[in-house]
Amino acid sequence: MSPADSLLAAADNALRTLFAKPGAAEKSPADAVAEAALDPAEKRLAGALMRVNHVGEVCAQALYTAQAALTRDARLRARLQQAAREEIDHLAWTRQRLDALGARTSLLDPLWFAGAFALGLVAAKVGDRVSLGFVAETESQVAAHLQSHLQRLPQQDLASRAVVARMKDDEERHAAQARASGALALPAPVRAAMKAAARLMTSTAHYV
């Protein structure tokens, strides 16, 4: 893929992620359970948590798109593109949950996308194994974050819980695949900086 083709593909992905309603290749896990009756406070909490999870999927699209655009390894590009396609399902599922809960997406989605895209470009520029290291660390942190949401979501909101549980399993698998592909372990200061940035994003997206 030429640099121009990569740029066009990245721009197309950004527009689709930010402004189009995503379509899932696989049915949402929420479809298998009944919608619960939540009181207003429970609905607000579930909506806020699913908005945060939707932001995470916006960032995943940006990260994978940037890394796939710069790698010269065709096999790695194919793996990144496949992971991005799977994350589109997550993007669609979280958007569906937001709609069902009467909640909106984050107003700062373009900012989150741009930041994650820049991070992906930097990681890819350093090298493929570092790029895979960012994937492994990001997915591991996201999986831990999703586990915390399973503890916070209303117990009766089985639809949101089903989506989050499936996403957690997928993120853990993506992290394991990145490590198996030769991901470098990132230095502790980098991991700490990523966690700090994630905390800022999640605390902001909870409300905005």
Swiss-Prot record:
Its EC number is 1.14.99.60. Gene3D superfamilies: 1.20.1260.10. Fe cation 2 binds at E87, E139, E171, H174. One of its GO terms (molecular function) is metal ion binding. Catalyzes the hydroxylation of 2-nonaprenyl-3-methyl-6-methoxy-1,4-benzoquinol during ubiquinone biosynthesis. Belongs to the COQ7 family. Disulfide bonds: none annotated. It is a peripheral membrane protein. The keyword Membrane applies. Fe cation 1 binds at E57, E87, H90, E171. The keyword Membrane applies. Pathway: Cofactor biosynthesis; ubiquinone biosynthesis. It comes from Verminephrobacter eiseniae (strain EF01-2). Its cofactor is Fe cation. GO terms for biological process: ubiquinone biosynthetic process. It holds the Pfam family COQ7. InterPro entries: COQ7_proteobact, Ferritin-like, Ferritin-like_SF, Ubq_synth_Coq7. It is found in: Cell membrane. Keywords: Cell membrane, Iron, Membrane, Metal-binding, Monooxygenase, Oxidoreductase, Ubiquinone biosynthesis. One of its GO terms (cellular component) is plasma membrane. The gene is coq7. It comes from the Bacteria. It catalyses: a 5-methoxy-2-methyl-3-(all-trans-polyprenyl)benzene-1,4-diol + AH2 + O2 = a 3-demethylubiquinol + A + H2O. Binds 2 iron ions per subunit. This is 3-demethoxyubiquinol 3-hydroxylase. HAMAP family: COQ7.
